[in-house]
């Protein structure tokens, strides 16, 4: 269910070219070394097929955490303070020149459809920290997706209750860790002097991602004890042998509690959606201020808003959360013997999802183009889940439609034959919705810090150099074959093997 982020890539950078440390001379060299590991890990992760990328996420997270220790030490040294807060030895870092670092945005809208947005050049260590922490939070969200993927695969045996509980609990913890990182960035963004170089690390986007991660974690708390998605998944699973499985009844109090939790998730998603739309509208308005300097495809990255797929995902998550709340209100009403109100709540949920009532309640007699299209889209989504590709881009909307349609068909049949209760309109029921109830609290993020022994060892002069001036680009390797020497040649002797102007003739 979490959003399928695409991790960014970055260019090579040498800290020694822009920073010098008098108290700990080896700090810039070590920071460059660990940043090179992050750059190489992100490059290798991007080149992997989608089915294999989940296995490298742990390496990405570990490399970023190792690099953050040195990056935060350099950041503390610029302010002439200790990286351990109020205690510990002080670091003195001098800024020699503005750093020139490039990052590829992963949430900004692209000027050319179907292509990646161009790289953004940053000249601030604060923006480097924002990109690094945002990448870490995105990697944690992707780890949560990888943990939840086995619960949605219908071509293998259904995981047991213990495996399901462990997967949801682990994914919830990862999402809350990501939310704490975004909360740390949101607090730190208040001290920024200039505008963000792109929409990915702007204060509005960071706050929106915090709300999004909190909404996803809240829905997972409901999903942990919600038996109906499991019933629908088992019904679609050909390998499931327990075909007579009956969904356990949810107590009335818990159904009402789950509904309020879903409403809280909907409120968080609505807040994230408004922040993203404000960011996109401000980005769109900024594109007209540049005059002739921002023509065609050469417009500035700061003038572009967020990716439309990301904004649509947040809106779908808001709709899905409200539809889940309507479903739990329906379960609460059905447990109380109010079948008519239960059916009305289900139809209110379909209205929130944008599904027309006539399509959800009509009899399945004969062939229908809409029915064929729906089955084809469901099979395509199942293949995405099996391959580990960009599944769940609809934020669980299709799954919730299946659950509501199953309950609507069951209760409508009971109401037509036995109860015969009046079904209220969705507008009447939606006006009675209570407020949401939060379950999770975002804990303060504790950035990693260098061990005092390691920090003391960097008082020694550096051994070697961190000059990455001739380092190849992370995505452009192999594109410029002219810069490489012939196979088997000794480094630095390329000109001796090349053909000069005087040797163009055969003799």
UniProtKB/Swiss-Prot annotation:
Domain (BRO1) ranges: 1-294
Positions with biased composition (Acidic residues): 464-478
Entry GO terms, CC: plasma membrane
TM ranges: none
GO biological process: cellular response to pH
Superkingdom of this protein's organism: Eukaryota
Bias kind Polar residues: ranges: 498-507
Region (Disordered): 437-507
Cross-referenced SMART domains: BRO1
InterPro entries: BRO1_dom, BRO1_sf, pH-resp_palC
Entry's family note: Belongs to the palC family.
Known role: Required for the proteolytic cleavage of the transcription factor RIM101 in response to alkaline ambient pH.
Name this polypeptide is given: pH-response regulator protein palC
Organism: Pyricularia oryzae (strain 70-15 / ATCC MYA-4617 / FGSC 8958)
């Amino acid at each position: 269910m979490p959003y399928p982020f695409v991790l960014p890539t970055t260019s090579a950078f040498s800290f020694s070219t822009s920073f010098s440390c008098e108290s700990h001379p080896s700090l810039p060299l070590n920071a460059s070394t660990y940043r090179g590991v992050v750059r190489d890990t992100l490059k290798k992760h991007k080149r992997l097929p989608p089915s294999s990328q989940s296995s490298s996420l742990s390496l990405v997270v570990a490399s970023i955490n190792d690099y953050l220790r040195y990056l935060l030490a350099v950041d503390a040294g610029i302010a002439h303070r200790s990286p351990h807060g109020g205690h510990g030895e002080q670091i003195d870092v001098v800024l020699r020149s503005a750093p020139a670092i490039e990052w590829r945005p992963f949430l900004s809208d692209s000027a050319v459809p179907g292509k990646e947005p161009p790289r953004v050049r940053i000249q601030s260590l604060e923006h480097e920290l924002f990109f690094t922490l945002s990448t870490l939070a995105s990697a944690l969200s992707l780890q949560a997706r990888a943990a939840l993927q086995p619960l949605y695969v219908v071509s293998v045996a259904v995981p047991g209750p213990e495996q399901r509980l462990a997967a949801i609990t682990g994914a919830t913890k990862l999402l809350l860790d990501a939310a704490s990182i975004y909360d740390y960035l949101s607090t730190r963004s208040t001290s920024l002097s200039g505008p963000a170089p792109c929409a990915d690390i702007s204060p509005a986007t960071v706050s929106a991602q915090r709300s999004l991660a909190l909404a996803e974690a809240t829905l997972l708390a409901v999903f942990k004890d919600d038996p109906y998605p499991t019933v629908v998944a088992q019904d679609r699973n050909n390998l499931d042998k327990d075909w007579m499985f009956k969904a356990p009844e949810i107590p009335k109090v818990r159904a009402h509690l789950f509904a309020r939790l879903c409403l809280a998730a909907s409120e968080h998603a609505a807040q994230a959606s408004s922040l993203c739309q404000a960011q996109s509208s401000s980005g769109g308005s900024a594109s007209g201020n540049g005059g002739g300097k921002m023509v065609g495809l050469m417009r500035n990255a700061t003038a572009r808003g967020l990716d439309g797929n990301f904004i649509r995902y947040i809106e779908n998550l808001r709709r899905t959360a409200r539809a889940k709340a309507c479903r739990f209100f329906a379960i609460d009403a059905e447990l109380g013997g109010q079948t008519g109100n239960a059916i009305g709540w289900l139809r209110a949920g379909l209205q929130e999802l944008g599904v027309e009532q006539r399509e959800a309640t009509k009899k399945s007699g004969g062939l229908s183009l809409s029915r064929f299209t729906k089955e084809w889209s469901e099979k395509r989504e199942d293949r995405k889940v099996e391959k580990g590709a960009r599944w769940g881009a609809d934020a669980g909307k299709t799954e919730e439609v299946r659950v509501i349609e199953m309950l609507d068909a069951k209760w409508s049949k009971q109401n037509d034959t036995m109860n015969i209760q009046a079904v209220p309109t969705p507008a009447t029921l939606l006006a009675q919705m209570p407020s949401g109830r939060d379950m999770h609290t975002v804990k303060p993020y504790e950035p990693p810090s260098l061990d005092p022994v390691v920090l003391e060892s960097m008082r020694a002069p550096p051994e070697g150099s961190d000059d990455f001036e001739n380092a190849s680009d992370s995505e452009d390797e192999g594109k410029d074959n002219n810069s490489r020497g012939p196979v088997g040649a000794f480094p630095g002797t390329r000109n001796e093997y090349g053909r000069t102007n005087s040797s163009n003739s055969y003799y």
